[in-house]
Amino acid sequence: LFYTSLSPNHLNVYIDVNHYYADKKRALFFIKNNEIYFINNLDNIIGIKDNQFEIKIDFIKEIKKYLQGEFSCKYANIAMNYCLNKGFSKEELLNRLITLKPVKYRLNKVFENKQFIFINDSKSTTSNSSKYCFETFSDRPRILILGGKHKSNKFNIKINDNDLVLIYGIDKNIINKEINGLLFNNLEEIMKYIKTLKNNYYVLFSPGCDSHDQYKSFIDRGNHFNELINIYFKYE
């Protein structure tokens, strides 16, 4: 099973959109049979050769015990139903769910106390992924942390009156023109500010930008976020 989105969110590493699509196409050369499925959106499953794919069982409720995020759960549901079509039993697949691990720093809940729930989404390098994170956690006020090297795609996120946007990094002024927030030089300044707040919040670290202005990678950035949680919140 091969599935991918065809949304050009990472054009900063490509010459243009045509090179982006060509790179996606090259992945097909690693498929060893002709049973290939493209998923460009969740309502449009395009099959090649074997066009009998169908969603037989909705595993979403079980999947949500192990994964965060609407699309992550729906993609996992599609993969599990593909396996059903290939002869795996429902019991086998449910047993495998126990071993399912989320992608590192993609919507990871890393700490919770009486006031804050911290979500580490450092893998977020586009405005679309920040928007997805923001909309995934919506049952309490949210603090959205953005920052880094801004890409060409603009931030188009609807912020409520009880939400906060905190922006840091080299392109904080550019980001602030697209989504108004409070400006900081670095992530540690933001964590110190959050420490002064009194209300209950989700703290969503979903930068929506490239990490290389202050970090080696999104993993380095995510590690630093966790370290700051330990320093300022975990041992209160």
Annotate the PLM regions.
Residues 1, 45-65, 162-165, 177-190:
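Active-site regions of enzymes building and remodeling cell-envelope glycoconjugates
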Residues 1, 20, 75, 79, ...:
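Residue-level signal for inorganic ion chemistry
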Residues 1-50, 60-63, 213-218:
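Flexible active-site lid/hinge loop adjacent to a nucleotide/diphosphate
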Residues 2, 37-41, 145-147, 161-172:
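Short internal beta-strands
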Residues 8-9, 42-43, 125, 148-151, ...:
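Short glycine-rich anion-binding loops that position phosphate/pyrophosphate groups of nucleotides
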Residues 63-163:
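Nucleotide phosphate-binding/pyrophosphate-handling subdomain across enzymes
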Residues 150-202:
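C-terminal helical cap/extension that packs against the catalytic core
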Residues 207-235:
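Glycine/aspartate-rich loop-and-adjacent alpha/beta segment that forms the canonical ThDP
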